[in-house]
Amino acid sequence: TPLYSSAASDVYKRQAMDQFDVIVVGGGSGGSAVAGRLVQDGKSVCLLEAGGRNNSMLVKTPGMMPFLRGAVNYRYETVPQKGLNGRTGYQPRGKGLGGSSAINAMIYIRGNSWDYDNWEQLGCTGWAYDDVLPYFKRAEHNVRGGGDYHGGDGPLWVSDQHWPNQTSRDFVEAAASLQIPVNRDFNGERQAGVGLYQVTQR
């Protein structure tokens, strides 16, 4: 239920705290996975999401992301970027159940391992890629099965694209002919290269 005022917010908070062990804010991939794990642990959970159910066909059709408006997309802009000659950067962020995963064409690519390792070098203890990888694996149910970089029994289904576009295949083939390394797993040991990414679909 959306919270429309601070007074209403206080009422909902008091009621929720009386009825639930835990309140999770945000119904995106992270919040939904956290809520699911807590329920498995026997907790009663209230999952709060500012947006709606995301039943629109625009949300359910991966190629429609450019047409998503404010009801399902916060449509953030960055501050002017020096490296972009003062331009701002568009940052789509999902509003509704599924969060940004509902409007990202179901693409499943983790952050680059170098970034995580760099965060730890900057003082963020516990954020090295080797530290966070077990959590990625625990969340993932990859149809390729579990292994060094993938989980096989988590709540988030990850699979190869069922119907990859022929243009995408042609692009990969053209890049390979130019000696650009083909990468069949962007969430594996090596993240650079060209290839078809996996998606969050069954």
Where in the sequence are the language-model features?
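N-terminal glycine-rich phosphate/pyrophosphate-binding loop and immediately adjacent elements
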Residues: 14-138
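Loop/helix-junction capping segments adjacent to catalytic residues or to phosphate/diphosphate-binding pockets
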Residues: 11, 32, 165
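Single conserved hydrophobic/aromatic residue that forms the stacking wall/gate
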Residues: 1-15
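Conserved redox-cofactor binding core of oxidoreductases
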Residues: 121-202
